[in-house]
Each structure stands twice: as structure tokens, then as C-alpha cells.
Amino acid sequence: MTEQGTSIIQEFDQTPAKVFEAVIDVRGWWSKNITGSTAAPADEFVYDVPDVHHSRIRLVDVVPSQRVVWRVLDNTFSFVQDQAEWTDTEIRFEISAGADGRTVLRFTHVGLVPEFECYDVCHKSWGFYVGHSLRKLITTGTGLPNEITDDVEVIGARMESVAG
């Protein structure tokens, strides 16, 4: 697999342990409509926005306070031709010590490249979920995940309100 992908790097005053706990609390920052487990190696979960996006993801590497790696096992989007664009990509959260005792979180969706039809939407979405919602969960204890009943219009409006 190519090492290319979309990345977001953030720094926090919180400890690596606190950043790690927020990352594995996927319902706290991505979507409350996650089924399955999201914390230990070999856990699998499903992310679903009905009629728009469905992903089944496995945790393939989990090292507390250091890293979490997901592998996308299967994925479908309603808005692209090639339904395999996310399949077999890796989503990495790498936690390390930064300057002045700060914690660095590097998020990379390895394999999500500009050539993909979904790239613009997915890049923007990760910017919201990781750059805003996960950041908020880490810094305040409350993220901005999708609600179980949210449809794509509600989700889009939430993203736009933060971006605007």
C-alpha cells in the first residue's frame, strides 16, 4: 500500500494517555451511530450514514498512549463509482511527545489520495471530525459526533457551521 494519504497534525496540552482515550472513543467524536468495539486489537466496528456511507473497520494495531491503526475492511459510498476507494486503506492515529511537553497527534488516512473520486469530500470530512470534533473531545471532553438520527444534510450543515 502506498504511504500517501491525507494527514492532519495537531498539538495538545493534554497527556498522551488523554489523547489516546479520546481517539478510541470513536462515538465521542465521529458518530454515535457506530456499532461494535473501538478500543482493542482485532475489534471491529461499523460506521453508517444510511444511504450515503457504510464502512466496516478493524483495529489492527493499538498501543496505549502511542498509536491506533484501523484497516478498512469494506466500504460503500452512494456518491462515487469505485466502491473500493477506501477498502484496504489504513487510518492511523500516532501520538508522540512534542516540543515544550505538548502531545502531538498525527492522523493519516493512508491510501486516501487526490486521485480518488471521494477525496475532496473525505478530506474535508476528516478535517471536521479529526481537526474539530476530536480536538474538542480532547480539549473540552465533548466532541461533535454525528447523532444516530442525523442524515447527510444535518451532517453537512454541522460541518459548514464550524468551517464558516
Give a label for each model feature:
Residues 21-29, 64, 128-132, 136-140:
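Short, intrinsically disordered, mixed-charge
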Residues 1-38, 163-164:
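Hydrophobic ligand-binding cavity/cleft-lining segments
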Residues 3-9, 44, 54, 67, ...:
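Intrinsic-disorder/low-complexity, polar/charged segments enriched in Ser/Thr/Lys/Arg/Asp/Glu/Gln
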Residues 19-23, 59, 70, 105-107, ...:
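Hydrophobic pocket/interface hotspot
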